[in-house]
Amino acid sequence: MNTSTNFESFRLQALIEGFDEALEREWPPLTLLDMHTHPFAAKAVVTRGEMWLTVGDLTRQLRPGDTFEIERDVPHAERYGAEGATYWVARRKD
């Protein structure tokens, strides 16, 4: 998955990989999401802006072209940069 593909290509690849859905998420500038979980696994690629993803003691800065994966029910926090961020995300509800 990379940003040189279009969203439809991302969505089709996600379905081939066994994900249930794919969508584009857009976050406003300086949004902060405290530690939380999701009832689904996620695989995403950042397409605009920047964000920081914290899992446990590790925080990663993510920019366009960077990818991340997180399993269901894993506690994590998200912080979005001064321009906000957009990413394409595939979700698997298992």
Residue ranges with predicted function:
Residues 18-19, 29-40, 94:
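Short beta-strand/loop turn elements enriched in aromatics
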Residues 24, 59-61, 75-77:
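Well-ordered beta-strand positions in beta-sheet-rich domains
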Residues 57-72:
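Short acidic-glycine-tyrosine-enriched beta hairpin
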Residues 1-26, 34:
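A short, N-terminal "cap"/entry segment at the start of jelly-roll beta-barrel domains
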